[in-house]
Amino acid sequence: MPKEALELLRLPQGGTAVDGTLGLAGHSLLMAQALGPQGHLIGIDRDNASLGQAKIKLASVDLKIDCPLPPGSQQGGMNPNLDKNCSRIHLLQGSFSELDKILASLKVSAVDGILLDLGISSFQLDDEARGFAFRFEGPLDMRMDPSQGVSAADLVNTLKEVQLEKIIWEFGEERFARRIAAAIVMQRAKAKITTTKMLADTVLRALPKGYTRGRIHPATRTFQALRIEVNQELEVLAQGLDVCFKSLKEGGRLCVISFHSLEDRLVKNKFKSLGFEEDGLVLTKRPLVATDEECADNPRSRSAKMRVIERIR
């Protein structure tokens, strides 16, 4: 939904914007082009490997990358008297939940637009060494930042059965969470679950035979639940929505693309409260969804929902 996102963000020429989930810079490339040669783009990602790939992609834009950004004005724009050698794109590792600190470190007071494309990128899914996907056999990791936190293997091999059930039920919305948690505990008593295939096979054995005939792989919800827990995705999102909204200048917009009901519900409720209690105007009364054509080109987009809010004061 890149076209719709750019239209709703309404980035001004020469403005300043943030891609809070940089990934492979698909959205960032379009944002940089919309901002023009005098604009500034800040790209953030928790995954350092994504930053390297994004830098390669953004090299096609006629904008310098990775020099320190200059101080911002009180209105959130950049100093109009910039040195012509200064960067227009700044990429850094971090989380959008800490955007206030990131902007402060760059001496940027506020921005014109922020995009959050939640979930996991194809780049991460397709790397078997990262352990996000069950279609490959790889280490059961799932960390967006491999240098921090516990892995999915740590969770499935150490948590109590009741804790695993809670995670799989709440974050995966998996109705057979109890059976799956019991199967995990039984399997790890025989041998530690260390690979994606071991976990997927364990889940399959726990499920009724008829349950394996659905549209999605039977292990999808369990993998989603563990990934959300490993990366604290909902906590990061809840904190990040507040931080991002407060980082907008007057008239600035925050666009969020979510991929499952837990994320979308959180975004919907937060935007609603920002509209009532803060200076927010929700621009999408109903979430925008991908067109049939886009779903055909990118099957992952079939579950995407986009919501946008504007800071009006």
Protein language model features and the residues they cover:
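Short Gly/Ser/Thr- and charged-rich N-terminal loops/segments
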Residues: 71-77
